[in-house]
UniProtKB/Swiss-Prot annotation:
Protein name in UniProt: Small ribosomal subunit protein uS12cz/uS12cy
Molecular-function GO terms, alphabetical: rRNA binding; structural constituent of ribosome
Matches recorded under SUPFAM superfamilies: Nucleic acid-binding proteins
NCBIfam families per record: rpsL_bact
Single GO BP term: translation
Transmembrane segments: none
Family: Belongs to the universal ribosomal protein uS12 family.
Function: With S4 and S5 plays an important role in translational accuracy. Located at the interface of the 30S and 50S subunits.
UniProt-annotated location(s): Plastid, Chloroplast
Length: 124
C-alpha cells in the first residue's frame, strides 16, 4: 500500500481496457485480401462446417474472418471489406466479412434480414 506522499508524487494509472477489434485500428471497417479460404468446426455442442477466410488487412494485420450467409464466391486474392463482430462458437474469429461489397457478392434468394447480407430490395 503506497503512502500519501508516494501517491502525490506518482498518481495511480487507470486500467486501460483492451480493444476487442485491434486489427481495425479504430476504424469501422477495413479492406483486406483473402490469403486462404477454408472451413472450421465450431465448439461443442454445435456441429457444422463454418466458412472462414484468413485475411491480410491494409493495417498490416492478418486475421481470421467469418463469411456469413449461405454460399459465397470468395477465393484466394479476393478483396473484401471486414467489420468487427465475433462468432460465438468459433474461437479466435472476431471479425466478419461484409457481403455485397468489393469481391464478396450478396447472398442469393434472401428475403428477410437483407441488409446484413448485401441484398437489394426485390422488384415487385
Amino acid at each position: 500500500m503506497p503512502t500519501v506522499k508516494q501517491l502525490i508524487r506518482n498518481a495511480r494509472q487507470p486500467i486501460r481496457n483492451a480493444r476487442k477489434t485491434a486489427a481495425l485500428k479504430g476504424c469501422p471497417q477495413r479492406r483486406g485480401t483473402c490469403a486462404r479460404v477454408y472451413t472450421i468446426n465450431p465448439k461443442k455442442p454445435n456441429s457444422a462446417l463454418r466458412k472462414v477466410a484468413r485475411v491480410r488487412l491494409t493495417s498490416g494485420f492478418e486475421i481470421t474472418a467469418y463469411i456469413p450467409g449461405i454460399g459465397h464466391n470468395l477465393q484466394e486474392h479476393s478483396v473484401v471489406l471486414v467489420r468487427g463482430g465475433r462468432v460465438k462458437d468459433l474461437p479466435g474469429v472476431r471479425y466478419r466479412i461484409i457481403r455485397g461489397t468489393l469481391d464478396a457478392v450478396a447472398v442469393k434468394n434472401r428475403q428477410q434480414g437483407r441488409s446484413k447480407y448485401g441484398v437489394k430490395k426485390p422488384k415487385k
